[in-house]
Amino acid sequence: MAKYEIMLVVRGDLDQEQANKVANELKATLKNTEVKENNYDGVQQLAYEINKLKTAYRYVYNFETTDVSLINEFRRLAIINKNVLRHIIINLEKDYGYKATVNTKKVQRNEKRAEVYARQKEEAERRAVERQAAYEAMKAEREAAGLPVKEFVKNTNSKR
């Protein structure tokens, strides 16, 4: 079952009974779901005006469902209803924000990537040490033969 969270913002100029009625009508579309949590935040001041309104009722529903058509129906009814100022539906199973740090598949994938990057870094450092040792040996040979010695180029990634 997929986990979802819905936030519903209802007009603040309605009285509480009307706002609850609007929210309950929309919640009724989620009939075959396991509602885990209902939060009613009451009338709150909006950060900015929406349709010339400064206050709104906020409802948050957390639930689980396998039927995506219920989510689509909820979205359709929320858009049609003029008393709903805003709504957002979030699939909590997907990796948004901090959820990516909790998702075991993503955590395992990131750990594997970190291991690969650590091995690549160790290999690059080992090759750099080998290059430095080869340079020192070449330098000693050339000095013994009386030939000029070139400077060691540390950045071997640059194209010459």
Swiss-Prot record:
Task: Please provide the record's keywords in A-Z order.
Answer: Ribonucleoprotein, Ribosomal protein, RNA-binding, rRNA-binding
Keyword hit for Ribonucleoprotein: yes
Give the GO cellular component terms, alphabetically: ribonucleoprotein complex; ribosome
Could you tell me the Gene Ontology terms of the biological process aspect for this record? translation
Report the InterPro entries cross-referenced here: Ribosomal_bS6, Ribosomal_bS6_sf, Ribosomal_S6_plastid/chlpt, Transl_elong_EF1B/ribsomal_bS6
Q: Does the keyword rRNA-binding apply?
A: yes
Positions the record marks as coiled coil are: none
**A single MF term (Gene Ontology):** structural constituent of ribosome
Q: Name one Pfam family in it.
A: Ribosomal_S6
| Similarity comment: family membership | Belongs to the bacterial ribosomal protein bS6 family.
State the function annotated in the UniProt record.
Binds together with bS18 to 16S ribosomal RNA.
* NCBIfam families with a match to the protein in the record: S6
Q: What is this protein called?
A: Small ribosomal subunit protein bS6
The protein's organism comes out as: Ureaplasma parvum serovar 3 (strain ATCC 700970)
